[in-house]
A protein has these predicted regions:
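Short, Lys/Arg-enriched N-terminal segments with co-localized hydrophobic residues
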Residues: 1-9
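A structure-centric signal for secondary-structure junctions around beta-strands
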Residues: 8-10, 98-99
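Local sequence-structure signature of Cys/Sec-based thiol-disulfide redox active-site neighborhoods
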Residues: 9-32, 36-41
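Thiol/selenol-based redox catalytic cores and closely related redox-interacting motifs
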Residues: 41-123
Length: 123
């Protein structure tokens, strides 16, 4: 079982607990009484196989959070040469570069938080 696998009853939210967007997603799920668990990259880690699963679902370009502080502080050469072949290694080394939260459940995939998308996915 990879890190992005989601069982039938428990929704796993992948992200970082102090991220405002993750907080919004967690609040929305709690407000709608949807059972969930946070998988915090800082606490629980993140492996390359899991990143590969997310990349297959969303594409590497959609996993990179170019609005993050980590992106702004990333070496310019890494930014310029970032490609499909290098992205997963860069993301594994810098998990705060991953757009969040990520939820995969029974064929549904969500990245980021949009109340409208969550409403459609969970109702």
């Amino acid at each position: 079982m990879g890190i992005f696998y989601l069982g039938e009853t428990m929704i796993i939210v992948y992200g970082i607990k102090n991220c405002d967007t993750v907080k919004k997603a967690l609040k929305w799920l709690a407000d709608h009484q949807i059972e969930h668990k946070l998988h915090d990259y800082h606490v629980d880690g993140l492996d390359k196989a899991s990143l590969q699963q997310a990349e297959a679902q969303f594409g590497w370009e959609n996993l990179v959070n170019k609005r993050s502080t980590t992106w702004r502080n990333l070496d310019e050469q890494i930014k310029k040469t970032l490609s499909k072949s290098t992205a997963l290694s860069v993301l594994a080394d810098n998990p705060t570069l991953i757009k969040r939260p990520i939820i995969l459940q029974e064929g549904k995939a969500l990245i980021g938080f949009s109340e409208k998308e969550y409403q459609a996915a969970f109702n």
